[in-house]
């Protein structure tokens, strides 16, 4: 397999101009195994949280395009809460952390876009996470970026580049 490095791809600084911000809409998954085990999450007001999520997306959309990944079961509610400037992208998701399950985007010397699809394992604890493990590939395909698959388990957002 060809590596991003061999094709002169690099991860641009976080502040570097980019095409859009990817977010994931909070999906209330009744099959989620461990949220009630986390005391600070056990009393989470899901609907209030969704409205706050929408406020964040709207604020970001004042400066750049926002693409919101939304579980098919949540499309109707997302359309009623999200501002019409937010692009809704329909795909199953288990959680709302695009920072962790999403792609790591790259550029090469010709400013061609690439993306790494890491293995996402639900932080080693939460399940199911199989839908979230497909989010990065979806993002890369939707962005028409060159696809790089990694077998490394990694939260893509844990890498910071300045």
How does the language model describe each region?
Residues 1-162:
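The feature marks the mature, well-folded catalytic cores of soluble enzymes
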